[in-house]
A protein has these predicted regions:
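Membrane-interacting alpha-helical segments
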Residues: 81, 85, 137-147
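Positions that flank functional sites
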Residues: 49, 140, 163
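Conserved acetyl-CoA-binding loop-helix of GNAT-fold acetyltransferases
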Residues: 101-102, 109-126, 142-150
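GNAT-family acyltransferases
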Residues: 1-106, 123, 127, 166-182
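Proline- and acidic/polar-enriched loop/turn elements at helix boundaries
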Residues: 46, 119, 136-137, 160
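Residue-level marker for beta-strand->alpha-helix junctions and adjacent short loops that shape enzyme
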Residues: 92, 140-142, 160
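Conserved catalytic-core motifs of GNAT/GCN5-like acyltransferases
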Residues: 134-136, 154-172
Length: 182
């Protein structure tokens, strides 16, 4: 299992967007929509400025086999950042990862999330060699729950007080998709 840049990036599967490597120069646009109250409500991000994202870029730039991978979801027309998607908690030993994604509200409700999640999950199984891809989703994030279910993820459990979210314990659903179950 390797993701050291040798594997071609997945195709988005959606006419509105394409995928490319996330770059440090994307931080202001990424922060702009992550700070939107409609996005904040359903995520565990606790950002004060675009500078708070910089440590993430250090991890994404690492060539280590367990380093997180994050791709930019960009509009085909104009190239503006519309979201990000990738893998965290990568275990080369167990061939597992956790998928994470976020989209700007401007592209919600257009099938973008379902398309890019399917594309990146298939890439994770076929190109990166994962056997299991899981997702944790805040219980109130009904849109993301529907995306995961449309993408053949199965609900595996309920994680009480799983993460602190802006000073409060948050409950999450655990979903997973297994390579053999595709």
């Amino acid at each position: 299992m390797s993701h050291s840049g040798k594997s071609p990036l997945p195709l988005s599967g959606h006419p509105l967007v394409t995928l490319r490597q996330l770059e440090r120069s994307d931080a202001p646009a990424w922060y702009a929509y992550l700070a939107d109250p409609a996005v904040v409500e359903h995520t565990s991000w606790a950002l004060r400025s675009a500078d708070d994202l910089q440590a993430n870029f250090d991890d994404y730039a690492s060539a280590g086999p367990a380093s997180s991978i994050r791709l930019a979801v960009v509009l085909r027309d104009g190239g503006q950042l519309a979201g990000t998607i990738g893998f965290n908690a990568i275990s080369p030993q167990h061939r597992t990862a956790e998928i994470a994604y976020d989209l700007a509200p401007a592209v919600w409700g257009q099938g973008v999330a379902t398309s890019v999640v399917n594309a990146v999950v298939d890439w994770g199984f076929q190109r990166l060699g994962f056997l299991r891809i899981q997702a944790t989703v805040l219980e109130s994030n009904e849109r993301s729950i529907r995306v995961l279910e449309r993408c053949a993820f199965e609900r595996e459990g309920y994680l009480r007080c799983y993460r602190q979210i802006r000073g409060r314990s948050g409950n999450f659903w655990l979903y997973a998709r297994i390579a053999a179950a595709r």
